[in-house]
């Protein structure tokens, strides 16, 4: 549950594993590069806890394969977690574990309350849609179907990431990798989310 300090997000003892685990790795014995030497279970995320406060930028640092992306994708419901809890202040006033939310409520959280920028733009963009349509998809998912608003928001977002607004009808597949990443950043911001998840956001920039 969110504490009195009004954290935007609280994550407690997040677990994500591939495999059933065994007595050895469940007792938190040392692993070999996140893999149990006895049963072969891979622990992508193991007992991760942190808080995020309003206006705070929190970075998770670790070597390649240490689980940084897995944490982000778990919070965005791309992975089904093995255990742990996460409480979002904007969802049920931080009193309900979002990992226990229904699929319908998870879509609401993703569409209204969160934005996600993946390391690979292919995961966050529809490459055959125009940039404007990518933004519109996110805005419509957040229950806003006002065309004038979507047009204005498209111009605002493209200008913010220094992409010519005259290219808004072009699909991201026509853009360089860095431009694709900037379009993806804009799409994640389209619904003004209270929480923005960034997975190595500067890739290609």
What are these regions (language model features)?
Residues 61-63:
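The feature captures the beta-strand-to-loop junction immediately N-terminal to the Walker
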Residues 149-166:
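Conserved ABC ATPase "signature" region
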Residues 76:
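Helix-to-loop junction immediately C-terminal to a conserved catalytic motif
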Residues 85-108:
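ABC ATPase NBD Q-loop/coupling interface
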Residues 120, 127-141:
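Q-loop/switch helix immediately C-terminal to the Walker
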Residues 171-175, 179:
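Conserved ABC ATPase signature
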